[in-house]
Amino acid sequence: MNEKLKEKVKESLSSVLPITLIVLVLSVTLVPMEIGTLALFLTGAVLLIVGMGFFQLGAEMSMTPLGEGVGKTLAKREKVLLIVLVAFALGTIITIAEPDLQVLANQVASIPNSVLIWTVAVGVGVFLALAVLRILFRVSLAKCLLGAYALLFVLTLFSPKEFLAVAFDAGGVTTGPITVPFIMALGVGVSAIRSTQGHDDDSFGLVALCSVGPILMVLLLGIFYHPTDAAYSAVEIAPVITTRDVAQQFALGFPGYAEEVLLSILPIAAVCVLFQLLTRYYRRRQLLRTGVGFLYTVIGLILFLTGVNVGFTPVGNLLGSGLAGSAYRWVLIPIGALIGYYIVKAEPAVQVLNKQVEDVTGGTVSQSMMNTALSIGVACAVMLSMVRVLTGISIYWILVPGYALALILARYVPSVFVGIAFDSGGVASGPMTSTFLLPLAMGACTALGGNVVTDAFGVVALVALAPPVAIQIMGVLYVHKSKAVAQNKADLLSDDGVIDLEDEEI
């Protein structure tokens, strides 16, 4: 167990370290910071690393077995209505505990946290149920995505522009480190039982469809809900002078975040207990392992949220405002690209997906191939986000052609690539995006006097758009390469046949 925890902490370190080093360099060059502020950031980074380590291990021990167990059990039932209701309930409950969603909700001033969280959670629940039905009835994923995104862009014509970027951001943050292991395991469980051939293709696409639900629900919220007049206010960093002041800031925030986490995790734990009582699916040892996993998840989430809200997010905001307020404001673009490149390389949820992709495709799509494609795509996405912050370009002019290209590419690649690509979009926009890149954009937008809701929000959405395009381009190249290899083999066989005939004549 200790070795696994060390491994998870190392993964978290590789995720947080690049950002930490970039901030340290900027703090002594373009954006000087007070020592106390830097101490808050570094302490927050440590809590983030340890918290994500505990959290990933806990999710692996609890969420993944729960998802796979529920998936296999449901798939054996013949009652479709029961399957739909259980998938909806579980999708909703699991999403409420997603830390990325809580981070986003704290930054949307005009919508109460509970309203936004429940709206998004219901969206995930509805589309998880639809995604399970897709597997059961073997409906094409590409057709489902085409219909879903067509509906989304019709709704954008009626929803207020203030909700557009927030809606697509919500779609990106909900599929994070707590929901991805559960949703993918649920898909594997259902497809393994219900499909006889090609179930590996079926197991992908759940994350992609679950990312659509929150976007749809928030756009509907914009049409029917009248938000408050609360305006975004810049995050203020508490004045800290001594190390005691630093410790005090984290100690003050700890109880509130502990309460949030416990309230979020308890329903999931209750579902696990109820599932065990009804099915007796787990043996005693598995049950103990799952219980320890929930404990690790709680510890990790508390450390994660405390580190993010007290030390990490405020410094991202400060850095953005400092860069935008300087004479070198355009440096935001290359710095954003650099951060985007390294963020996705070690995003926890991405690593979960990459490993499962490599296993399912038998190594055809390796982890290194996935990482390279995602890193380049996300770097370009963050560059566009920073251009939006500096110029005020509407996100609509990027999202529409971007998703149109992704859906067109889906016609020319194998179905497994479609599922992988759109799943990657949901998981690439993970903790580091919502906790650092979004505050960075918000700080820069505030310093420039822009509209935070329309210009800064949307970073997560563009990061989520990059993988569907990048990976499907990789899929097109893979198809052409496979055809070339097949043709070469055919030519060789043909040549061998001619030689054999000549030998026979001699």
State what each model feature region is.
Residues 60-78, 103-109, 312-324, 349-365, ...:
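Flexible loop linkers connecting adjacent transmembrane helices
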Residues 19-23, 51, 79-87, 147-158, ...:
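Small-residue-rich segments of transmembrane alpha-helices in multi-pass membrane proteins
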Residues 41-53, 110-122, 170-183, 235-236, ...:
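Structural signature of hydrophobic alpha-helical transmembrane segments
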